[in-house]
């Protein structure tokens, strides 16, 4: 839901607390996570890593709801790639904030995606891609005790945030879950 996609950025940036942030977003979706991060005024650069070339083409062709606003922002870049694969390898660069909104949940993954990202080992690898004081945020439509446990093994500070929203199509209140892990700052 777009409320929770925006909250993924907002809460992650609040948890970080810094400015001039370098942000990586795994998965473009409809662009709400990226746009919300840019709208805070605390982001210096934001890169979306999107595995589907069609989605990048839709963005470039103006078919994604926020295409025009994202494409005209000089801080924004989007490229084709596998965010999970990038985070599994050695870091070429370190980010202040990494926001992942790719799968429906750790247990309901899209396609044949390897689940290792959600494991302690996968999160340790992702942790290496964060600057000191950096934050990893993960979106899920369902609560995941196993993700919370793995994050508690890897990160110095973990925060789990439920985001409730009205689903008017089925006339129900639903809850999305946001998971945040913060890497210790040298000064803390």
Label each residue range with its predicted role:
Residues 153-188:
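Core SAM-dependent methyltransferase catalytic element
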Residues 2-132, 138-139, 144, 149, ...:
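The AdoMet/dcAdoMet-binding core of the Class I SAM-like
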């Amino acid at each position: 839901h777009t409320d929770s996609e925006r909250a993924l950025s907002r809460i992650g940036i609040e948890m970080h607390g810094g400015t001039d942030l370098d942000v990586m977003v795994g998965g473009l979706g409809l662009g709400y996570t990226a746009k919300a991060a840019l709208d805070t005024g605390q982001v210096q650069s934001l890169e979306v890593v999107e595995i589907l070339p069609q989605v990048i083409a839709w963005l470039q062709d103006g078919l994604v709801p926020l295409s025009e606003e994202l494409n005209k922002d000089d801080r924004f870049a989007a490229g084709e790639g596998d965010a999970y694969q990038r985070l599994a390898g050695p870091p070429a660069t370190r980010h202040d904030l990494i926001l992942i909104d790719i799968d429906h949940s750790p247990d309901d993954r899209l396609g044949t995606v390897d689940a290792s990202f959600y494991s302690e080992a996968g999160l340790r690898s992702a942790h290496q891609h964060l600057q000191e004081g950096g934050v990893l945020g993960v979106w899920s439509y369902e609560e995941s005790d196993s993700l919370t446990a793995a994050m508690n093994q890897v990160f110095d500070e973990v925060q789990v945030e439920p985001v409730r929203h009205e689903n008017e199509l089925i006339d129900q209140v639903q809850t999305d879950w946001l998971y945040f892990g913060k890497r210790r700052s040298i000064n803390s």
